[in-house]
Amino acid sequence: MDLMNTQLGKEYTVLQIDAEDPELETFLFSLGCYSGEPITVIARRKSSCTVAIKDGRYNIDSGLAGAIRVEDR
């Protein structure tokens, strides 16, 4: 499933990033968002969501959130 279809406040594990743009993958990697890392959706809006990755919180748009594939921890 992708981040836009997760439960709020529940921790998931990143499976893969399905971004067509390698720069997006590099950007997410710089935030600590890569395969095997825990991620939690804190808040969701129509066009974006706020996620907790490691010690940071980030607001990402729905397109990017849809490219992040996760599984239950």
Stretches found by the model and what they are:
Residues 1-2:
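Absolute protein N-terminus
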Residues 14, 39-41:
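Conserved hydrophobic positions within beta-strands
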